[in-house]
Amino acid sequence: MRIYNTLSRRKEEFKPLEEGKVKMYVCGPTVYNLIHIGNARPMIVFDTVRRYLEYKGYDVNYVSNFTDVDDKIIKKANEEGVSAEEISTRYIAECKKDMEGMNIKPATTHPLATQEIGGMIDMIQTLIDKGYAYEVNGTVYYRTRKFAEYGKLSKKNIDDLEAGHRDEAHSLKVTGEDEKEDPLDFVLWKPKKEGEPSWPSPWSDGRPGWHIECSVMSKKYLADEIDIHAGGEDLIFPHHENEIAQSEAANGVPFSKYWMHNAFLNIDNKKMSKSLGNFFTVRDISREYDLEVLRFFMLSAHYRNPVNFSHDLMESAKNGLDRILTAVDNLRHLSENAKDVIMTEDEKKIIASIDDIYKKFEDSMDDDFNTADAISAIFELVKLANSNSSSDNSKEYIDTLMKKITTLTDILGLKTDKKEEMLDEDIEALIAERQQARKDKNFARADEIRDELLAKGIVLKDTREGVRWSRA
């Protein structure tokens, strides 16, 4: 198995630090709103990486955090007149609903930044003691130039960097830039401002900088040195670069052996942004498609290639997924009435020929998790099943064919189990209850009903003429 390592900029043979075990950390979302489809890509991609590693026999300790203290969370809380904790708790719950819809397995651990403040204070103190950090007026900064290998992940030369040369969306804006020893130094701890959550520390009542959070949670729930650290390519600099500087200075060992990053997602060939009106949450997509279609769409491209999201491409993904699900459904129906006899020699030959398709699938996944080519192998298997199955076949043969397909779809996290169909009158009754909830301004219950129907494959569309529904 070969993985493209951002650190070396080449594919490397995958050899975990401990045989048979994989320690994997994936940067999770900042929970101040519903997750958008850009957030969904790393969730789906690295969940699939995890599933394939488990299929290969590895014991995967998969840690993915929730950033539950951040400027955006505080801003949202102040706008709504509630606590930051209330905002983060609400959107963690909503995020988990979306993750379930996309069939993303719960992480081994989902740590919360606010629950790990003690560990962050300890690591910051270690960095101060080692001379890698310093305190000024209650703020603690990291001495960027002291870490000789700074820039090794992003391939940025520290001498070419200028203050402010950081992703604007992720920059930690701290007043008093002139108090830094060097403009490139970044914040580890900042003093509280009015209306912000804070924690006591040796330097000031305040809160941690964003970068220190992942260094500490990775250390606590995995180890000082881990196998895979992953996230979107927008995190390479400054977030992951700063994590390396913190962790390696504090712990004295390499932070992660392999670094994996997924490419950006565009909408109709444009960057997704609220100002362009092309911003979609996962919940938005769920109103038109089963979220399994979104998962299939994301896996139809290699994770390191940019993905272009459009309605036409989602329709294409829906049709592709339907081909697979229909094949499994047909086999399921054949199995119910098939003869309970042993396989014939001809049937055994067909099953044996599937080994070649499995090899194609595994070769694709072993080559830096090429899910696009892996899906092509599944389509090849579906074609074989469609043209070599009938009511004349044995039950053992039909069941084996079906199992061969579902083993591969399970690796990609694509569910093939049949959804129980709701009766029309039950659907109409729930829609009526939803309409009443909206009249009563009980929007939480209205959303709950819509999500409940969606989970059963029923898509609602609000129109001027009333609510229309269809089966996904």
Curated annotation (Swiss-Prot):
Chain residues that bind ATP: 274
Catalytic activity reported: tRNA(Cys) + L-cysteine + ATP = L-cysteinyl-tRNA(Cys) + AMP + diphosphate
GN (gene name): cysS
Keywords tagged on the record: Aminoacyl-tRNA synthetase, ATP-binding, Cytoplasm, Ligase, Metal-binding, Nucleotide-binding, Protein biosynthesis, Zinc
Required cofactor(s): Zn(2+)
Motif placement: 'KMSKS' region: 271-275
SUPFAM superfamilies attached to this UniProt entry: Anticodon-binding domain of a subclass of class I aminoacyl-tRNA synthetases, Nucleotidylyl transferase
HAMAP family cross-referenced by the UniProt entry: Cys_tRNA_synth
Biological-process GO terms, alphabetical: cysteinyl-tRNA aminoacylation
Sequence motif 'HIGH' region, residues: 29-39
Top EC class of this enzyme: ligase
MF terms (GO), sorted A to Z: ATP binding; cysteine-tRNA ligase activity; zinc ion binding
Residues reported to bind Zn(2+): 27, 214, 239, 243
UniProt-annotated location(s): Cytoplasm
Record's protein name: Cysteine--tRNA ligase
Family assignment from sequence similarity: Belongs to the class-I aminoacyl-tRNA synthetase family.
Co-factor remark: Binds 1 zinc ion per subunit.
